[in-house]
């Protein structure tokens, strides 16, 4: 009986997605690279992704392109769905995040390559008037994107991130059902079922451990209890953790 219920549930998912694709609806948010999309189907709701690489190889830049800029462009072409990104910037400030967006837009729109320092005319570099005019033309993009992307740069511990995400979802949905006696948890029901929620943490090696925890324990707890159990399985979020892959540094940090 249980086996039949499992199969029937799986079959329902398969048939629902097949019908949705045949009707031209979205089942995953595709990347702008055709070859990559053949190997990786894009972002799916209720999944946990980890973007990992060694120090200073562009993890944050790749994350912003694939999970912020590409998602923004994809959904612009699919107005039947909506999205919200809760981007927890543990390393950079909110200002630095949006400056990096302007830098990316300048390259995409005008093939102009500028660092954040150059955007702010630091050091020996002074921004020219023509580039400043082009920066001003990015305003509509940034204004529109910032209405969908919340950059949180003041929350550093796992529970704080969990609470922020949980509170946002309660403002945009409700919890129903549940039974203490039967040990059944409440189910989350979004107000808008066509809204895709993203939780991005960049990067989890910078999480602040709770009192008595090591960094290794804090990362494990965050991934297992908050990301997998709550964000993914309960809230159905697209959850992305950026992880620094520097084994020597990690071992030193984990054992402090």
Residue ranges and their predicted role:
Residues 100-102, 248-256:
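Short regulatory helix/loop adjacent to the ATP-binding pocket of P-loop NTPases
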Residues 146-149, 195-198, 234-240:
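Loop/turn-to-beta-strand initiation segments
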Residues 206:
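Residues immediately C-terminal
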Residues 150, 209-220, 252-256:
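Flexible beta-alpha connector loops of hexameric P-loop NTPases
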Residues 38, 73-193:
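Cytosolic-facing regulatory segments adjacent to core modules
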Residues 72, 218-245:
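Substrate-engagement module of ASCE P-loop NTPases
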Residues 2-110:
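The Walker A/P-loop phosphate-binding site
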